[in-house]
Amino acid sequence: MIINIGELARVSDKSRSKAAGKLVEVVSIQLKHGVKDEDSEVKVRIIPKDGKSKPQFGYVRAKFLESAFLKAVPAKGIETIDTSHVGVDFKWKLGQAIKFIAPCEFNFIKDDGRVVYTRAMCGYITDQWVEDGVKLYNVVFLGTYKVIPESWIKHYSNALYA
């Protein structure tokens, strides 16, 4: 990642700095002859979560800085639509129980505390919207939720299974 003084960045959890995992502002960059740019020492100001705390500073290697703003990109095989017109018709209705199948396993915690891995799940649609041309649905199941694209939904489900 190319960084400039004054930019916002996130420090990777892999860093051993006290700024690891935090949002920071780049204060200065120390470049030395013979040292790779990625190994340059960067002074950062840790941005406090409450916005009021006294500023703290830390030092990290440039290779541990990540973009603070992530851009979602639709995965291959996900259908996209043209959103230039007003009003989008969603195939699956709000409040309905549906069954979806994810392309890879995800986990959820059962009532007894066990972690279970699955690809298929039933749940209720609680929200729907279009983002970057992809129709997305918020599906609630077993006390948690998952945002899924329309192509994962297979059919309406019996409410007993949701």
From Swiss-Prot:
Gene (UniProt): motB
Protein known as: Transcription regulatory protein motB
GO molecular-function terms, A-Z: double-stranded DNA binding; single-stranded DNA binding
Keyword NAD: no
Species assigned in the record: Enterobacteria phage T4
Membrane-crossing residue ranges in chain numbering: none
Keyword presence, ATP-binding: no
Keywords, sorted A to Z: Transcription, Transcription regulation
Record function comment: Compacts the host nucleoid. Probably dysregulates hundreds of host genes including derepression of most of the H-NS regulon. Plays a role in the transcriptional regulation of middle promoters.
Source taxon at top rank: Viruses
Summary of subunit composition and partner proteins: Monomer. Homodimer.
InterPro entries: Tscrpt_reg_MotB
Pfam families: motB
